[in-house]
Amino acid sequence: DIETTGFTARSSCLYLIGCAYYLAGKWHTIQLMSESYEQEADVIKAFFEFAKSYRYLIHFNGNNFDLPFILQKCEQYKLPYSFEDYSGVDLYKRIAPYKYFLKLPNCKQKTLEQFLGIDRKDVFSGGELIGIYHDYVKNPSEFSENALFLHNADDIKGMLEILPMLSYYD
């Protein structure tokens, strides 16, 4: 799951990449955050260094947003990475066909979480976090850092809790 300051890689910053991974019988998370705008490429490098041990990527709408955004940033920084060696599962793409059957207003991750009764601890939207990140870069604070990490952690946790919906997929 990525957090960015906008929807277009050309004019926005990728400031946080969060991953869940399964090891020794349980789920763990890792979060890679750019503490300044200049560290963006370092976060991407650290992500690919971490991901090279894995072959599968599970994401929520990553085919349409996360993966293209990261690849555009790789181009921008002339980084030699791609997702060609990975197999992926886009939870959004797999669940969206059931939107009307489930009587959902949309297939946003937070909507699916509410449908499943999953509680989030974070109170900010991704859009609200943009300002919090810009404030954090100028004047780092524990509040801002915690808000940024918590939102991403809840997104990751939510994806893991949405995964069982795929057991009904044909």
Could you describe each region identified by the protein language model?
Residues 2, 59-62:
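Short His-Asn-centered micro-motif
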Residues 12-15, 24, 28, 62-162:
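Metal-dependent phosphoesterase core characteristic of DEDDh/y 3'-5' exonuclease domains
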